Amino acid sequence: MGVVTAGAVVAIVLAAAGGPPDDNRAGGSPSPSSARSQPATPSDGPSPTVEGTSRPQSLPPGAHREAGGFAWATPTGWRRDIKTGAEVHYTSPDGKQELAAKSSLARGDLMETWRTSEQNAHQGKDYRKIRLEESTFRGNPAVVWEYTFTLEGVPWHARLLGFNENGKSYQINTWYQPDVETQALKTYGEVRDSFTVL
């Protein structure tokens, strides 16, 4: 219940703040899943074939499409939890890591939205910001938010990545317990690199 609960807490804090685009945890939104994919190769979309048609977009190995307008390769054996059509979470079999991805319509300045959410996250137990900074993701402006918090006596580490593309906002997030950090970061990196906007 720790991972799912951690996600719920984050969702409440972010919702109260107008939350970062697609984030639901007291610092992010958790989701169960582990990646075993290879880095995605960004594509500008399907290439034209015969006049008026296009070739379907190719996905990274192991990636599957989600209703939110994206595809990603999630770990085998992780529990899938669909929050909404545009938000999906995966939880590792041991419950020590969650992955989440979501999409929504872009609303204003991404960094300002996340700063507001971060201010509200101070309500969480033992919340400690590590960083909240602008970045890029595949050439798009992005925001990275990293922090720690405690839920039901269990420490958690969160890494959230948000970016806007073509009028939509996307998030690729993870929450994990510190004792699985090495594997959790490897899994998150693989899942993040497989993320493809459709």
Where are the language model's segments positioned?
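Solvent-exposed, non-transmembrane segments of extracytoplasmic/periplasmic domains
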Residues: P39-L198
